[in-house]
């Protein structure tokens, strides 16, 4: 009986009291004057004393993303969308041309052509795969100790009634506001693995059919090429947040949100990008009293807020909208 009582006492309070959900994006950290903007990341990998892997990544991103990479108006959501549009098709076509030589020139060294085919794609694989690691290296340089709490935001939080879903990797909530009911959905410093990138996870795999090859071609060479072609797909996916898989991984968390009697959803610095909307859709679908919910945006950008309202309506949000003042000015 004691165990049952403790279960009800601890878990019952946890499930019944939570009435506030805060959804936080990068604008939240930037409102605390933390250098976590896209431009800050670019400045980091452009610095003169950057190690070679960061310089190589910079050149690589310029090549595959183009001039917008340097645009001062470029935001994280723009960067993520551009990563999703990265086109390796020319590199793959070049490889397929080299593959053709494997069987067109049967009198030549197939291993030589195999190497020529896979070398450029191997480079793509290694450089693209470095992005998450370099990103994490950068985010670890952000000094949260320099941030000060925003009192207008702090006053919104009702003790033991608030839960936080953050898309940030920093521990701003934990260290500046001493909050513990925090879910870092894309990972965090000194926490779960960090997810960064676009949302276009590939299921397809590039391969070259062995029956098209010259019989004299070494099967090991063909296997090497196919392995590297698959690696290009893996490199593209290393730039992706596999949202579908991440939702499955965090199914328990989203189930717990459904158990709460959420009455207010506060949104601070979150951009409602298509990539992250599957999470928001799950939240909307799980609200107990959808018509009575207030979805409350930071008043930082009213034009953006009106766009967000339209996005939420399209995703079947039936409640009302409001604003809160997000600075102490």
Describe the function of each predicted region.
Residues 1-32, 41, 48, 247-329:
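SIR2/sirtuin-family catalytic core signature
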Residues 11-14, 43, 217, 223:
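N-terminal non-cleavable signal-anchor helices
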Residues 20-59, 163-166, 170, 176-194, ...:
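Conserved catalytic core of sirtuin-type NAD+-dependent deacylases
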Residues 37-77, 321-328:
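Extended charged low-complexity segments that act as oligomerization/scaffolding linkers
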Residues 39, 55, 74-77, 151, ...:
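Generic alpha-helical secondary structure signal
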Residues 56-231:
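Extended, H/D-rich, highly charged conserved domains that either
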Residues 143-153, 239-257:
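A Trp-anchored, charged/polar loop motif used as the substrate-binding/catalytic surface
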């Amino acid at each position: 009986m004691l165990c049952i009582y403790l279960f009800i006492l601890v878990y019952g309070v946890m499930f019944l009291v939570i009435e506030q959900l805060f959804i936080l994006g990068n604008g939240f950290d930037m409102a605390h004057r933390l250098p976590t903007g896209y431009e800050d990341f670019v400045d980091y990998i452009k610095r003169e004393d950057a190690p070679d892997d960061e310089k190589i990544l910079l050149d690589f991103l310029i090549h595959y993303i183009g001039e917008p990479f340097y645009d001062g108006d470029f935001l994280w959501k723009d960067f993520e969308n551009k990563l999703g549009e990265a086109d390796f098709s020319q590199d793959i076509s070049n490889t397929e041309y080299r593959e053709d030589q494997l069987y067109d020139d049967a009198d030549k060294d197939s291993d030589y052509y195999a190497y020529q085919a896979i070398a450029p794609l191997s480079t793509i694989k290694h450089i693209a795969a470095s992005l998450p690691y370099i990103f994490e290296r950068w985010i670890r340089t952000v000094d949260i100790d320099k941030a000060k709490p925003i009192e207008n935001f702090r006053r919104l939080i009702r003790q033991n009634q608030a839960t936080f879903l953050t898309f940030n990797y920093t521990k701003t909530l934990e260290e500046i506001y001493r909050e513990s009911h925090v879910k870092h959905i894309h990972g965090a410093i000194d926490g779960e693995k960090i997810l960064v990138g676009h949302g276009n996870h590939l299921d397809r795999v590039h391969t070259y059919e062995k029956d098209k090859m010259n019989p004299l071609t070494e099967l090991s060479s063909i296997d090497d090429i196919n392995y590297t072609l698959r690696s290009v797909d893996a490199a593209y996916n290393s730039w992706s947040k596999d949202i579908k898989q991440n939702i499955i991984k965090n199914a328990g968390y989203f189930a717990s949100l459904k158990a709460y009697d959420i009455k207010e959803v506060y949104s601070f610095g979150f951009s409602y990008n298509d990539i992250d909307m599957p999470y928001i859709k799950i939240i909307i679908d799980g609200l107990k009293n959808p018509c009575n919910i207030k979805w409350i945006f930071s008043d930082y950008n009213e034009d953006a807020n009106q766009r967000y309202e339209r996005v939420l309506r399209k995703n079947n949000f039936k409640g009302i909208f409001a604003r809160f003042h997000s600075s102490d000015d």
